[in-house]
Every structure is written in C-alpha cells, then in structure tokens.
A protein has these predicted regions:
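Alpha-helical substrate-recognition element adjacent to the catalytic core
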Residues: 2-113
Length: 115
C-alpha cells in the first residue's frame, strides 16, 4: 500500500491567511511560513494583529466558508484516492480546515487544533 501526503494551503486551496488579509484589509496578515519559518513566532504575531483589530475565530471562519478549492483540486484528490491512500498534512487548524474538507470530499487530514 502507498500513502501520498499533500499540503493543504497553496496546493489544494488558496492560502487562508492571504484570503483573510484581503477580506479584512489587513495586509500584514499576508505573511506565511514562507516569510517567517518559526511557526510559533508567526502565530503569536498574527494573534497580536487580530487582537489589535478586534478580530477572532468567527471572522476567520466566515472568510474560510467562502474559500473554494483550487481548480481541479477535488477531482485530483478523487483520482488519487482511487489508487492510493491520500493524507493531507497541514499546519492549519481543524477549526479552519473543516469547511474546506467538506468541499474536497472529506479527505483525511492531519493538523492541529485550537482546543
């Protein structure tokens, strides 16, 4: 048996924080792990910016609900799962990923939780 592992953001769906940055009008939130590889430092920085603007999980989830998979992503996953086990491994949160997983046909995802 083979297992194929994929990232989520930038591979199957657009970058969540970039989408939220565009909707919220806060350009600083465009920063990703490509810009700041220290994940803990990046997340603390993001949380500080969210607090400064009075934003929280509900507003982020509202934006995520409007995000669609990249063109062909669901079809690609469907074909991949016909021949191998496909697992998404991501640094996103369960609370962010759930609506996206529904749109992708509920693939297996390993990620972190805010709980």
């Amino acid at each position: 048996m083979y297992i194929t592992c994929l990232d989520l953001e930038g591979v199957l769906v657009p970058e969540i924080w970039i989408a939220f940055s565009e909707v919220s009008g806060i350009p600083e939130l465009r920063r990703t792990t490509r810009d700041e590889p220290d994940y803990e430092k990046l997340m603390r920085w993001r949380m500080d910016i969210l607090r400064q603007h009075g934003l929280g999980l509900r507003q982020i989830q509202d934006v995520i609900a409007q995000i669609d998979p990249l063109p062909g992503a669901k079809e690609f996953l469907d074909e991949l799962r016909a021949t191998t086990q496909a697992v998404i491994v991501s640094d996103t949160f369960e609370e962010f990923a759930q609506p996206l997983m529904k749109k992708l046909g509920w693939p297996t995802i390993l990620c972190i939780s805010l709980a």
